[in-house]
Every structure is written in structure tokens, then in C-alpha cells.
Amino acid sequence: MYYPFVRKALFQLDPERAHEFTFQQLRRITGTPFEALVRQKVPAKPVNCMGLTFKNPLGLAAGLDKDGECIDALGAMGFGSIEIGTVTPRPQPGNDKPRLFRLVDAEGLINRMGFNNLGVDNLVENVKKAHYDGVLGINIGKNKDTPVEQGKDDYLICMEKIYAYAGYIAINISSPNTPGLRTLQYGEALDDLLTAIKNKQNDLQAMHHKYVPIAVKIAPDLSEDELIQVADSLVRHNIDGVIATNTTLDRSLVQGMKNCDQTGGLSGRPLQLKSTEIIRRLSLELNGRLPIIGVGGIDSVIAAREKIAAGASLVQIYSGFIFKGPPLIKEIVTHI
């Protein structure tokens, strides 16, 4: 397959520049006959989850296509679902560059992007142009300059604007790169947020005559007690699903490697065991009351199977996709 040669060239570039270059090419072909250049035929393996039918259990995790610019080109590669975002109500530049780092030996990434995106209105316009026939998730967050105490307002603004166009909505309260965001995972702050989100979901369902499920994305760095509390809150508020997990602040598996001390969230292979353990513990706690979407370090069929064995109904890839390319999609969907 050609991807090892493509990767070698891309890895000569700064990580963010490589991403920008790749997306520049994908934008050129998305929605055109040239999508055939990236199209892969993958077997149909339907999965019912959150009241939706997914063509296959493998999705693209949020963060790669933040603004929904390349939905059709990515869909042509065989993903059963694509999660775009994280998007915020207003455009924001994110954190200062450099903010994305490769740990090549560990096949990991560290990012401190900071929800750089062009805003929810721009994303909606891109979604309207897309023809992807899989499940489209839209991941939403708060603007950096919105006080945490008012953070729920940003989620509600985004929900209102994307509801008509989303297959499901992902609530990102677990990025380590927006100051104070992870505090929304705990106690009264979480209950307050989930109450507001559920009420808004009910209002929007009545308005649009369709039910769009809500999934909450959690961190891998939760303690046992925190995980129990999160699970309890999700069940009490009738949330439709949970995405486990986001990136980690833990560096124990990458000590001594180049870039290991960079600030930000670590993803890729070093996250695999940690995220799988969270899924296993979460699955025991939830006992089937809501489905888990497993993400974190999946870079092989074995890693995907481990997530499902731990309790995930669906899985997503991001860093593994960067390191292994489109062939990983076909490999996982075919053999999972």
C-alpha cells in the first residue's frame, strides 16, 4: 500500500503543517469524482447503538476534521461514523504554535491545540454541503474566554445550531487544553450541565420532530470514585452514550522520549491500556444501561477487539489513523 511512502513524506513536515497539507488535498477532492482516489470498499457490519444504525463499528474520532471540511472524502475511506469538531460557538485560534508533537517511537501524539476552529456557523454550512451516508457526530465545546461558570451556555448555543444536522451530539468536557474544562466532569457542575443539556435536547426534539442522541466524552485520568460519580450522573440524566476516552496527562509510558515533556494531552498507542481500563471499569459500573464508544490508542485489529471486549459497542480512531493511514480502516472493519 502507498501509505508508508506518504507517511514518510508527511513526517518530514511539522505535524500541524502535515495536517494542513493533507486536509488541503482532501478539500480539493471532497465532493468530486476524485474521491475515488481514497475510496475503499469495506464490508457492511451494521451496529445498532443509541437508537442509530452504524454501517460498521469503526468511527473517526473528533479532532481531525474540526470544521467538517472533508466529511465526504473521509467517509469514502470506509468509516461507519465520523465525529467532527470540537466546535465552539465563536471562532477561536486555539493555543500558540507549536502545539502538536509526534512521539514517533511510541506512535503517540501530544496536542495542546485548544479547540482551534472556525465556529459553529461555519461548520453547519460545511455539513449542509456533505453527502456522507454514515452517522455524523458533532462534538461541541466551550470557547476559551467563556467563564467555566457560564460554560453550559456555549454547549446550548451549539446544540441549537447543529441539532438538525447531527446524527448524534458529543459533549466534550474532557479536553485538558481548555482551562477549567475538566471541572465540568465533577459533582454539581456536571449535574447542572447535564440537566441543561437534557432540557435543551427535549425542546429541540419537539421543535425538529426528531431525537438526536447525546454522548458525553470523558477523560482517562478519572479516579475510581470520580468514574463512579460520572457513571451515576450519566444514568440519572438519561444521557444516551459515553465516549471513553479523551487524551491523557499521564506520561508514565513515554518517559525519556523526544517531546514527552510537552504540555498537552497524550494520545495514540501509549493511551491504549489506560483508556481500555477506563472502559472496563465504566462498563461494570453502567451494567449495560448506556453504550460506550471506545477510543484511545487503537492502531490494530487487536487493540479494537480489546476495547470491545472491555465493553465498548463502537470504536473510534485518530492517532492510529495518522500513523497507519486508510489501510487501518479496512483492516479493522474487515477483521473486528
UniProtKB/Swiss-Prot annotation:
Give the residues the record marks as binding FMN.
A62, G63, L64, D65, K66, T86, N139, N172, K217, T245, G268, G297, Y318, S319
The yes or no answer to whether the keyword Flavoprotein is present is yes
Matches recorded under SUPFAM superfamilies: FMN-linked oxidoreductases (SSF51395)
Q: Tell me a GO biological process for this protein.
A: 'de novo' UMP biosynthetic process
Top EC group: oxidoreductase
User: Does the keyword Oxidoreductase feature in the UniProt annotation?
Assistant: yes
Gene Ontology molecular functions:
dihydroorotate dehydrogenase (quinone) activity
* Catalytic activity, EC: 1.3.5.2
Annotated Gene Ontology cellular component terms? cytoplasm; plasma membrane
Biological pathway: Pyrimidine metabolism; UMP biosynthesis via de novo pathway; orotate from (S)-dihydroorotate (quinone route): step 1/1
What does the entry's cofactor note say about binding and number?
A: Binds 1 FMN per subunit.
| Disulfide bond annotation, renumbered to this chain | none
**Which parts of the chain span the membrane according to its record?**
none
- The protein's required cofactors: FMN
Protein role: Catalyzes the conversion of dihydroorotate to orotate with quinone as electron acceptor.
Give the PANTHER family listed for this entry.
DIHYDROOROTATE DEHYDROGENASE (QUINONE), MITOCHONDRIAL, DIHYDROOROTATE DEHYDROGENASE (QUINONE), MITOCHONDRIAL-RELATED
HAMAP family from the UniProt entry: DHO_dh_type2 (MF_00225)
What protein name does the entry list? Answer: Dihydroorotate dehydrogenase (quinone)
Q: Which taxonomic lineage does the organism of this UniProt entry have?
A: Bacteria, Pseudomonadati, Pseudomonadota, Gammaproteobacteria, Enterobacterales
Task: State which gene encodes it.
Answer: pyrD
